């Protein structure tokens, strides 16, 4: 039978030939020990077959022969940063609902773009509906089960390991929603991982513990006034381990003028209660708010990191954006508000990043709201990179957790640790004694793993933590995801660093804190890890009596 010439083939057949050719070149490069620029190979090969479009990465990954998957897929992985910290993050959104403080302040925050009453009517509070997470949620009609399944499949297709999943529950103040809806939402997140259909939250958590895809934590976005004792207890039941608290400003006048609906005192109280319950606390902060100015902005971040009443474990930096339909948009249009210039904003972010202590992680430095929706504010989509470049010019460094992580260092600078040692940093925060333990390569400033230990204050309200108890608020070994039961000698997870950090934490709790018991706020899927080293479940915590 006559073989078809290139001109006789359909575009789909030509695309199949292109994908096969790309994979052949990748295999040859691997066998010769050469590095290869995938984008150049895709462009060149597509042109060779007369195609204007390049093959999709998802299709290339799907077509890799089984015997080469182990070596080629990690090289093809799209956006390796997504799992460089050792965890696949799955962001989900709850249904649109009104902001809880409307009932007593009469309005939402002046800068807030979203919500059911906004110009973006099908969006959740503080989102426009055009962010990637929002669009995935809208496609799934805000169904938590579908959002989770779709995102996990998407990450798998892009070559990421999804053995460990951390959920981020976004979409406004989740804890202001009715209890029945909250239970339904969290139950479905756990069920989407375990495959079990649960009748209640306790059953969902029980099955999630034994799931092959481990839920190593849930992060919930909330406000300081929805972070009180009953809210914290509910979140512990869900398997939540980290809180993202909307602070925005440490100035009382700014909180009042922007219609936040809570005081700065409420921020300090929520941090104290949350840390005494074992939660990791991430703060959302907004530089460039009305009536602040550059000097006051720098002062507030100095205060935020140095004052023991604040000192968060993590930071999401969201420079103020002017978006159509907000109160701030009207102020901007009438000339009563003006955003910082691009150069001033880069300078400010650079100086803020230089203030961040080594125990704090900067998760984000800008919102992912599409630029066409922004009337004034951030003009660059790569603000972090521009701030780092400015820091280099100024001769200052960012030493936050994320910048020093081994996985991130490997991706950006191809640097691997050489001389690893235990580093200890002690500080006082929110009424308790904090110890930040880490394994680092001090010469190259690379962080391999960390542990946050707290001697709870006397104000702790959880009965499991009363009377001389120390709590491990976080244990995390960085580097690419390694399944919980396996070892990969080239990756840093499961090389024993976690065990060494736990042993040192137990020693400090026993000998220095004088504690008779140590507790761990553990993600639902990692409880069995602690059972193996002598811990048992008490309420939402894994606990161990210290001899």
From Swiss-Prot:
Protein name (record): Elongator complex protein 3
Xref: PROSITE patterns: GNAT, RADICAL_SAM
PTM annotation, UniProt: Tyrosine-phosphorylated; phosphorylation on Tyr-202 does not affect elongator complex integrity or ELP3 protein stability. Also serine/threonine-phosphorylated.
E.C. code: 2.3.1.311
Catalytic activity: uridine(34) in tRNA + acetyl-CoA + S-adenosyl-L-methionine + H2O = 5-(carboxymethyl)uridine(34) in tRNA + 5'-deoxyadenosine + L-methionine + CoA + 2 H(+)
Chief localisation class: cytoplasm
Cofactor: [4Fe-4S] cluster
Keyword Transferase: yes
């Amino acid at each position: 039978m006559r073989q078809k010439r290139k001109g006789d083939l359909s575009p789909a057949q030509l695309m199949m030939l292109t994908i096969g050719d790309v994979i052949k070149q990748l295999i040859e490069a691997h066998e010769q020990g050469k590095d290869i620029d995938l984008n150049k190979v895709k462009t060149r090969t597509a042109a060779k077959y007369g195609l204007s479009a390049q093959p999709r990465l998802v299709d290339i990954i799907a077509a890799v022969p089984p015997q080469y998957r182990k070596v080629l897929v990690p090289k093809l992985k799209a956006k390796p940063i997504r799992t460089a910290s050792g965890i696949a993050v799955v962001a989900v959104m709850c249904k649109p609902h009104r902001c809880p403080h409307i009932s007593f302040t009469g309005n939402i925050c002046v800068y807030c773009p979203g919500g059911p009453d906004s110009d973006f009517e099908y969006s959740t509070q503080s989102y426009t509906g055009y962010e990637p997470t929002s669009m995935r949620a809208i496609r799934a009609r805000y169904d938590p089960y579908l959002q989770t399944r779709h995102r996990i499949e998407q990450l798998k297709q892009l070559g990421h390991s999804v053995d460990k999943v951390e959920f981020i529950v976004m979409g406004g103040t989740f804890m202001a929603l009715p209890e029945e809806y909250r239970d339904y939402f969290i139950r479905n997140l756990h069920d989407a991982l375990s495959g079990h259909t649960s009748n209640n939250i306790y059953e969902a958590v029980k099955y999630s513990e034994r799931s092959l895809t481990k839920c190593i934590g849930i992060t919930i976005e909330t406000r300081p006034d929805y972070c009180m004792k009953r809210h914290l207890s509910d979140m512990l039941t869900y398997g939540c381990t980290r809180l993202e608290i909307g602070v925005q400003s440490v100035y009382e006048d700014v909180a009042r003028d922007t219609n936040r609906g809570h005081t700065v005192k409420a921020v300090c109280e929520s941090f104290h209660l949350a840390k005494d319950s074992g939660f990791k606390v991430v703060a959302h902060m907004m530089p460039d708010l009305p009536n602040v100015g550059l000097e006051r902005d720098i002062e507030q971040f100095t205060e935020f990191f140095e004052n023991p009443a604040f000192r968060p474990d993590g930071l999401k930096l969201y420079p103020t954006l002017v978006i159509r339909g907000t109160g701030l948009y009207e102020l901007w249009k009438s000339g009563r508000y003006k955003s910082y210039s691009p150069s001033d904003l880069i300078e400010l972010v650079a100086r803020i990043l230089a203030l961040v202590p080594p125990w704090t992680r900067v998760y984000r430095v800008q919102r992912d709201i599409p630029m066409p929706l922004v009337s004034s504010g951030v003009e660059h989509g790569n603000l972090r990179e521009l701030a780092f470049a400015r820091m280099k010019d100024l001769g200052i460094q960012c030493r936050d957790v994320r910048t020093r992580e081994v996985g991130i260092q490997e991706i950006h600078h191809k640097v691997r640790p050489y001389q690893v040692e235990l580093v200890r940093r002690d500080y006082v925060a929110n009424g308790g004694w904090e110890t930040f333990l880490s394994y680092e390569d001090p010469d190259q400033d690379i962080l391999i793993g960390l542990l946050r230990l707290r001697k709870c204050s006397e104000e702790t309200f959880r009965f499991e933590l009363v009377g001389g108890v120390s709590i491990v608020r976080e244990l995390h070994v960085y580097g690419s995801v390694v399944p919980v039961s396996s070892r990969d000698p080239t990756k840093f997870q499961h090389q024993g660093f976690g065990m060494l950090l736990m042993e040192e934490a137990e020693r400090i709790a026993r000998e220095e804190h004088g504690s008779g018991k140590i507790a761990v706020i553990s993600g639902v899927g990692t409880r069995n890890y602690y059972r193996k080293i002598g811990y048992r479940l008490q309420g939402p915590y894994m606990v161990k009596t210290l001899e």
